[in-house]
Amino acid sequence: MARALMRFSRRELPGLAAGAVVLALSAMPTFGQAVEASAEQVVQRLVEDIWATLRRDSADERHRVDELMAVLEARTDVALISRLALGRYWSRLPESERQDYQDLFRDVVIRSMARRLNTYAEDAKSPLQQRFRIVSSTAVGEHDVLVRSKVFPSHGQPLDLDWRLREGPSGPVIIDLIIEGASLLVAQRSEFAAVIERGDLEGLLAELRARAEAT
C-alpha cells in the first residue's frame, strides 16, 4: 500500500487536491439551498411560536394579542414592510413623520394580524403537524426566498399560504404573506394608495391614528 502511494509524483498532488476539493464542495449545499433552508426554518419557528402562544390558556384576550404581536415582530421586518406598503409615497413622507407612520403601521396592521391569528385558538388544540406543512421553497430574485406551505383548518378546504422572506443582517425575515395567491403587502399598498389619492399623506396618517385609537 505504501509503495502504491509513493508512485504519485509531486506534480500529480495539486490535481488530486483540486479533485478532493471539488468532491467536498459537491457534497455541500449551495448558497441558494442554504438560504432557502434558513428561510424555511424561520417560517417553521414562527408558526411553532404562534401555535405555542395560542395553546396557552389566557383569559385576557388583549394580553394574548400583545404576545402574538411580539411573536410576529421577532420574525418579520416591520419597518421594511411599512415602507413597502407606502410604495412611492415613502419618499414624499417628511422624515419628521416617518417614525410616527411606522409606529401607527405597527399598532394598526400588525395588531390586526395578531387579532386574526387569535381567532385560531381552537385549531391550535390540534397538533401543529395536522394543521400546517411546509411544501417547498425557491429563490426569488437576488435577495428573496418564497416558502410555500399548506394550512389545514379544522373547517373548510386546505389553503395555500406562501411566505416571502428577504435576507437581512441577521438572516431571512418575513416581508409578505400570500394567501391563495393574494399578497397582503400588495393589498395593503393598494388600500393606502387609495386613501392618499382621496386626500394626501396627512389623510392617511389621520386615518391610521383613528384606527389605532379604536383598538
Where are these regions (language model features)?
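N-terminal secretory signal peptides
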Residues: 1-9, 16-27
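Sec/Tat signal peptide C-region and signal peptidase I cleavage site
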Residues: 28-34
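Surface-exposed, charged secondary-structure patches
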Residues: 103-107, 111-159, 214-215
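Short beta-strand edge/turn micro-motifs at domain boundaries
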Residues: 158-186
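Low-complexity, intrinsically disordered terminal/linker segments enriched in charged
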Residues: 176-215
